[in-house]
């Protein structure tokens, strides 16, 4: 485990999957308010050398963000003299087994306002490069450059009518790896952006993968820039791997 102080009131604790396993924890344990989760946080706090201003500081709130190979826990202190508040993790009732609905509820509660904003590097670099091409190149040169960029990367926006369809999509693509993925909600519709790296693949790879995606998803009627501006982002990176790795009941 590693700890980094972000500000006077916020710590970031990075917990590897090996750390979780050693403590008998799973990713889904963070999605419900239960005694096991509370005990784990007390244990982590005992094991780490907390800054002095976090010791006996009153109420602490926790926000959990799953990553591809770890869990990031953001610890925020307040001046209220109360016990640890674990309600920030979720407001769901106890359940037996993780259902898609419960997982989605936890995502909406915990992730859409998270403060650890890390750019979705590959997609952002792709968009930035295309923008620079637009602004600096003549039309013939621009066409050649854009074609070269698209040969290396392509991205798709997929739509899902409900969260069950998202789960089916992730389960149906268990063995598929992508360069990047984001997960959004807009109204009652869910969206996922998928970035594919094409440089080492045959010419037909992109079309084959898109056809495979559409076996489980729908063609989106929104672009990624539109979703970035208007939709709620539930996972801003590694959305597909996280959903693939989750065990559904």
From Swiss-Prot:
Belongs to the MecA family. One of its GO terms (molecular function) is protein-macromolecule adaptor activity. Homodimer. Enables the recognition and targeting of unfolded and aggregated proteins to the ClpC protease or to other proteins involved in proteolysis. It comes from the Bacteria. Transmembrane segments: none annotated. Pfam families: MecA. The gene is mecA. It comes from Streptococcus thermophilus (strain ATCC BAA-491 / LMD-9). NCBIfam families: PRK02315.1-4. InterPro entries: MecA_C_sf, Neg-reg_MecA. The N-terminal domain probably binds unfolded/aggregated proteins; the C-terminal domain interacts with ClpC. This is Adapter protein MecA.
